[in-house]
């Protein structure tokens, strides 16, 4: 696996359940189209899997 992941929040969470909104916020996103670099670990991968339809993920 890659050591880091580049996450980009690409789609709005309007109409999504509150749990998915909380997951986006817990990943550290504040604005749409924001990109973050996160360490690749099972916890982050689990969060990504819950909101994969809202994110674009690249391995670095």
UniProtKB/Swiss-Prot annotation:
An annotated GO cellular component:
cytosolic large ribosomal subunit
Which InterPro entries does the UniProt record give? Ribo_uL30_ferredoxin-like_sf, Ribosomal_uL30_bac-type, Ribosomal_uL30_ferredoxin-like
Keywords, alphabetical: Ribonucleoprotein, Ribosomal protein
Keyword Repeat (UniProt):
no
Query: Molecular function (GO) terms listed?
Result: structural constituent of ribosome
Biological processes annotated in GO: translation
Q: Is Chloroplast found in the keyword set?
A: no
Question: What family does the database annotate?
Answer: Belongs to the universal ribosomal protein uL30 family.
Q: How does it assemble?
A: Part of the 50S ribosomal subunit.
The protein depicted here goes by the name Large ribosomal subunit protein uL30
Species = Syntrophomonas wolfei subsp. wolfei (strain DSM 2245B / Goettingen)
């Amino acid at each position: 696996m890659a050591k880091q992941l580049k996450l980009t929040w690409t789609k709005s969470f309007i109409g999504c359940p509150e749990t998915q909104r909380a997951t986006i916020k817990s990943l550290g996103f504040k604005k749409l189209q924001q990109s973050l670099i996160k360490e690749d670990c099972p916890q982050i991968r689990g969060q990504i899997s819950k909101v994969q339809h809202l994110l674009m993920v690249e391995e670095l």
